[in-house]
């Protein structure tokens, strides 16, 4: 019988969540944080990001939201988990709105690749992934394009050994989307 490969678990920093997850999230996994608007997806992502980010495992937060990262940070600073000392050191925020507005998913992927190569993060967050999906709908064959984008993103993040989180507004578990076919884990908020 072959020996099982041990998967390292990353503590989320969220009280009670690690116990539910069997000790934390699997390292190098590709995860989705989903739920309706206002349910706390971005706050949960930030709490996990600040808990996981370190000089050895930097975090990259790619935002496609309409609001600038500065406004988002202003609200997140109200929480105890927020650590101003990690900003632009262990935690980097990058705005992908310009690329998303082109509707070209290849352009969005190129920018993500460039940022990951430059910063070599151990943890990557894309918020809001639904904005990327909606931007990609301006292309001709949207389903094929989105499926290709998702597969490429999942393969690249895995090869770079980055634990990845896609944050998205989904209203029901049955919302059809290619993201569900590549996600290793799903955290559904209500």
Predicted regions and their residues:
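Conserved P-loop
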Residues: 31, 36-102
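Pre-Walker A adenine-sensing motif
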Residues: 12-24
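Conserved nucleotide-binding/hydrolysis micro-motifs of P-loop NTPases
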Residues: 65-70, 97-102, 129-132, 164, ...
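Structural motif
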Residues: 32, 123-125, 165
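Phosphate-binding/switch region of NTP-binding enzymes
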Residues: 151-158, 162-190
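Phosphate-binding/switch loop-helix module in NTP-utilizing enzymes
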Residues: 97-158
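Charged, amphipathic alpha-helical linker segments immediately N-terminal to NTP-binding catalytic cores
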Residues: 1-4
């Amino acid at each position: 019988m072959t020996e099982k490969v041990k998967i390292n678990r990353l503590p989320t920093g969220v009280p009670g969540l690690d116990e539910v997850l069997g000790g934390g999230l699997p390292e190098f996994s590709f995860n989705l944080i989903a739920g309706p608007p206002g349910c706390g997806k971005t706050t949960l992502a930030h709490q996990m990001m600040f808990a996981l980010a370190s000089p050895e495992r930097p975090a990259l937060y790619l935002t496609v939201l309409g609001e600038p990262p500065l406004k988002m940070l202003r609200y997140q600073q109200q929480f105890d988990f927020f650590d101003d000392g990690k900003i632009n050191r262990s935690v980097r925020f990058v705005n992908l709105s310009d690329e998303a507005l082109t509707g070209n998913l290849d352009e969005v992927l190129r920018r993500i690749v460039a940022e990951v190569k430059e910063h070599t993060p151990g943890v990557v967050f894309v918020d809001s992934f639904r904005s990327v999906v909606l931007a990609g709908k301006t292309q001709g064959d949207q389903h094929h394009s989105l499926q290709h984008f998702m597969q490429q993103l999942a393969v690249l993040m895995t090869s770079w050994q980055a634990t990845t989180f896609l944050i998205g507004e989904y209203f029901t578990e049955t919302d059809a989307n290619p993201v569900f076919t590549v996600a290793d884990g799903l955290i559904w908020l209500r």
